[in-house]
Amino acid sequence: MKQFNYLSHKDLAVVVGGRNNWQTNVGGAVGSAMIGATVGGTICGPACAVAGAHYLPILWTAVTAATGGFGKIRK
């Protein structure tokens, strides 16, 4: 398993914006919450709608971060 890389203050100063702008990020999070609520509500009602609206944006955030959508480091 790969070890974590720690960034110094100097390294953090060269972090640039990601591929997404804030509108894309807000739209993605809201859209994933709506889809999660719809799919969860269809499967087993209000309880699953709440769970879907909560957990799908978390999954969307993890996938977006893992694929570099939030930012990259300039070398």
From Swiss-Prot:
Top-level taxon of origin: Bacteria
Cleavable signal peptide: none
UniProt lineage: Bacteria, Bacillati, Bacillota, Bacilli, Lactobacillales
GO biological process terms held by the UniProt record: defense response to bacterium; killing of cells of another organism
Keyword Nucleotide-binding: no
UniProt cross-references to InterPro entries, sorted A to Z: Bacteriocin_IIb_lactacin-rel (IPR019493)
Keyword Chloroplast: no
Alphabetic keyword roster: Antibiotic, Antimicrobial, Bacteriocin
Primary role: Heat stable bacteriocin active against Enterococcus faecalis and other Lactobacilli.
Assembly notes: This bacteriocin depends upon the complementation of two peptides for activity: LafA and LafX. Associated with a 180 kDa bacteriocin complex.
A Pfam family assignment: Bacteriocin_IIc
Family per similarity comment: Belongs to the bacteriocin class IIB family.
Prodomain residues: 1-18
UniProt feature coiled coil, ranges: none
Protein's recorded name: Bacteriocin lactacin-F subunit LafA
